[in-house]
Amino acid sequence: MKYIQSLRLRTLPLSVSGIIVGSGLAYPLMPPTNHSFATGGFWAIFILAIATTLSLQILSNLANELGDALKGTDADQHGRAAYGLQSGTITKEQIIRMIWGFAALSVLFGTTLIYSAFGSLFATPSLVFFGLGLLAIIGAVTYTLGRHSYGYMGLGDLGVFLFFGLLSTIGSFYLMTQTLTWEAVACGAAIGLPCVGVLNLNNIRDMANDRIHGKHTFASLLGPIGARVYHTLLLIGCLLLFALFGHYWTLCIIPLWAWHLWFLWTHTERLDTHMPVLMFTTLLVALLTLV
């Protein structure tokens, strides 16, 4: 149980949103004979993509905790529950072993996923996806870990958009259909925007502390007002992109996101209480694309 807090399980539903969107777009394009799990079709690829993504997300969470702890960024987060490493319930050596373990799981699930999709580990598409998988692992680890962690250089938002949005959606779509459409690209961008919003909300909350410890997030560069304008545009952009390709059911989320934005614009504290709101409404938006 002492490891559970460091896994940050509440982030996991958000991480699969792109897989849901990409898979939903791919399903109607696949022949019914490819819908069987036994034939390595839709459901096999979907489940393996989910497993790979969850492993990568937990890997990122663990590396993020270790990186922030080593840099001292999480040492003065008043009003927040301490994670395992910060509270002393687990050691640095234990969390490093967990990082290696989930990196290995990511490779295992990812390799099985690639073979299930292409029937070979050495075909050109397979090699491309191996390269993308390696980039995903590097991106998961180096967000806050290492001397040149991109999360400390204002590039975290771009990383989330690329990995949670474009790669997650387009990757799952291509693995299932072995083709690419503009709708898949646009929907990948669309679901990536509120995922960036989750990181932005986190960075607005931690803005003062991040500046003290030299963590230059995009939110800290924009300032409190600019970061809120940016946040608003992320959510509006998401809905506009989905509506552009006929996913009108996603507009049902407007009342919840309007409430979320009202809270963000009228509060400077307790922003952490809206982190689950944005995470689960983003997942809901992904599910609404299936309607």
Located regions from the model:
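Multi-pass membrane catalytic core of lipid/isoprenoid biosynthesis enzymes
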Residues: 76-120, 215-246, 280
